[in-house]
Amino acid sequence: MAHPVQLSLQDATSPVMEELITFHDHAFMAMSLISFLVLYALLSTLTTKLTNTSITDAQEMETIWTILPAIILILIALPSLRILYLTDEVNDPSFTIKSIGHQWYWTYEYTDYGGLIFNSYMLPPLFLNPGDLRLLEVDNRVVLPIEAPVRMMITSQDVLHSWTIPTLGLKTDAVPGRLNQTVFTATRPGVYYGQCSEICGANHSFMPIVAELIPLKIFEMGPVLTL
């Protein structure tokens, strides 16, 4: 999870998040190069005596500043489109879990395990144990398997919410009357934190998400054993 004064992204826990980090570095290098070139042009203009201030036609310059930005945009767009395809791809998920947003808590339903349903509320500060994270702990974590494709069906019962876990590269809107889906494959066990990422009312900041990722063999014994 993130920590104070962290400048980089969180460590990836899914292939999609690894792709997002790579794309972030790719785009950052492109923006850094553009910023350097613009700064160099500005400094050159300020420090160089202009010898011709009445240029009315510069065909080569116009060609360069038209083609070069187009090439840069293409180089940024291609990996972005690939990631968009990966995030929307659904390849025969092994498990389906439904997440329903409320003001201001989440409800989870394990449709593959007899319709197991439970609510997940933020723990008040008085109920926290030593080492627990303030405003991020919940009474019931959503338990998910690793190394298996999981489909999350996400919706809302009242207003707009957004189910988000950064380390998994997940952010899917929960829209009333609409069922959105996202598929992911976690790569390592652990406890990972997220929050509702859509302003949903007075207690929007008190709507955390905690996912506990466990080995597939343990999960197949039944998620109720880990709740």
From Swiss-Prot:
It is a multi-pass membrane protein. Residues 46-59 are mitochondrial matrix. Its EC number is 7.1.1.9. Binds a dinuclear copper A center per subunit. Residues 1-14, 88-227 are mitochondrial intermembrane. Its cofactor is Cu cation. It catalyses: 4 Fe(II)-[cytochrome c] + O2 + 8 H(+)(in) = 4 Fe(III)-[cytochrome c] + 2 H2O + 4 H(+)(out). SUPFAM superfamilies: Cupredoxins (SSF49503), Cytochrome c oxidase subunit II-like, transmembrane region (SSF81464). Cu cation A2 binds at residues 196, 198, 200, 204. GO terms for cellular component: mitochondrial inner membrane; mitochondrion; respiratory chain complex IV. It is an enzyme of class 7 (translocase). Gene3D superfamilies: 1.10.287.90, Cupredoxins - blue copper proteins. It comes from the Eukaryota. Keywords: Copper, Electron transport, Magnesium, Membrane, Metal-binding, Mitochondrion, Mitochondrion inner membrane, Respiratory chain, Translocase, Transmembrane, Transmembrane helix, Transport. GO terms for molecular function: copper ion binding; cytochrome-c oxidase activity. Cu cation A1 binds at residues 161, 196, 200, 207. It is found in: Mitochondrion inner membrane. InterPro entries: CcO_II (IPR045187), CcO_II-like_C (IPR002429), CcO_II_C (IPR034210), Copper_CuA (IPR001505), Cupredoxin (IPR008972), Cyt_c_oxidase_su2 (IPR014222), Cyt_c_oxidase_su2_TM_dom (IPR011759), Cyt_c_oxidase_su2_TM_sf (IPR036257). The chain crosses the membrane at residues 15-45, 60-87. GO terms for biological process: ATP synthesis coupled electron transport. Mg(2+) binds at residue 198. Component of the cytochrome c oxidase, the last enzyme in the mitochondrial electron transport chain which drives oxidative phosphorylation. The respiratory chain contains 3 multisubunit complexes succinate dehydrogenase (complex II, CII), ubiquinol-cytochrome c oxidoreductase (cytochrome b-c1 complex, complex III, CIII) and cytochrome c oxidase (complex IV, CIV), that cooperate to transfer electrons derived from NADH and succinate to molecular oxygen, creating an electrochemical gradient over the inner membrane that drives transmembrane transport and the ATP synthase. Belongs to the cytochrome c oxidase subunit 2 family. Component of the cytochrome c oxidase (complex IV, CIV), a multisubunit enzyme composed of 14 subunits. The complex is composed of a catalytic core of 3 subunits MT-CO1, MT-CO2 and MT-CO3, encoded in the mitochondrial DNA, and 11 supernumerary subunits COX4I, COX5A, COX5B, COX6A, COX6B, COX6C, COX7A, COX7B, COX7C, COX8 and NDUFA4, which are encoded in the nuclear genome. This is Cytochrome c oxidase subunit 2. It comes from Macaca mulatta (Rhesus macaque). The lineage of its organism: Eukaryota, Metazoa, Chordata, Craniata, Vertebrata.
